[in-house]
């Protein structure tokens, strides 16, 4: 535990791999100065359904963690015409063994939906300040035209349900 507080805290690629993400998030909150900014990256439940399907296939096929098996899996996916395979090919993580291993074989992964994030923010006493991606925000604003819509997690949840891959990149 740090005995220091910060104006800005960024956490990417960590909380969703912890045994208890909420406990980790709570610790980060204690390190945030009042009025500070916390930027958190989490995996989207909806946007990672293609990865869930591929993990099920990996389990069914008994594919292991060695480089040869992972390369063979990658070849199978590249040659496939399945929609969930075509989605993963778009990920930069698909093209490096270490990042593909992390993407498909990580032993622990928690995925989040927006209502759960909203609940966590409320429980932690944090305020949602918006999403960072200009591209995503720009698309959202086409159907959510009021300024306050940008900070309305219920509207974001509806938007994500209509666009399930919007948060595919953490």
Where are these regions (language model features)?
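Short secondary-structure boundary/capping segments
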Residues: 2, 25-27, 45, 53-59, ...
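A short beta-strand submotif of the Rossmann-like class I SAM-dependent methyltransferase core
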Residues: 11-14, 40
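Rossmann-like AdoMet/SAM-dependent catalytic core
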Residues: 70-170
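Conserved class I S-adenosyl-L-methionine
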Residues: 37-88
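A short glycine-rich, Lys/Arg-flanked "PGG" loop and its adjoining helix->strand segment in the class I
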Residues: 22-37
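A short His-aromatic
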Residues: 16-17, 31
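A short acidic, Gly/Pro-enriched loop at the edge of an enzyme's catalytic core
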Residues: 1-9
């Amino acid at each position: 535990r740090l005995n220091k507080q910060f104006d800005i805290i960024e956490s990417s690629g960590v909380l969703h791999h912890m045994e208890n993400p909420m406990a980790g998030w709570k610790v980060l909150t204690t390190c945030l100065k009042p009025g500070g900014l916390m930027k958190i990256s989490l995996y989207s439940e909806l946007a990672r359904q293609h990865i869930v399907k591929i993990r099920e296939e990996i389990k069914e096929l008994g594919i292991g963690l060695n480089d040869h098996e992972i390369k063979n899996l990658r070849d199978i996916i590249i040659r496939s015409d399945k929609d969930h395979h075509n989605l993963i090919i778009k990920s930069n993580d698909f093209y490096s063994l270490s990042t593909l291993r992390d993407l498909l074989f990580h032993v622990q992964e928690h995925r989040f939906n927006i209502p759960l994030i909203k609940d966590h923010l409320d429980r932690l006493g944090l305020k949602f300040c918006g999403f960072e991606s200009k591209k995503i925000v720009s698309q959202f604003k086409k159907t959510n035209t009021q300024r306050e819509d940008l900070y309305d997690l219920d509207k974001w949840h509806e938007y994500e349900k209509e666009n399930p891959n919007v948060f595919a990149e953490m």
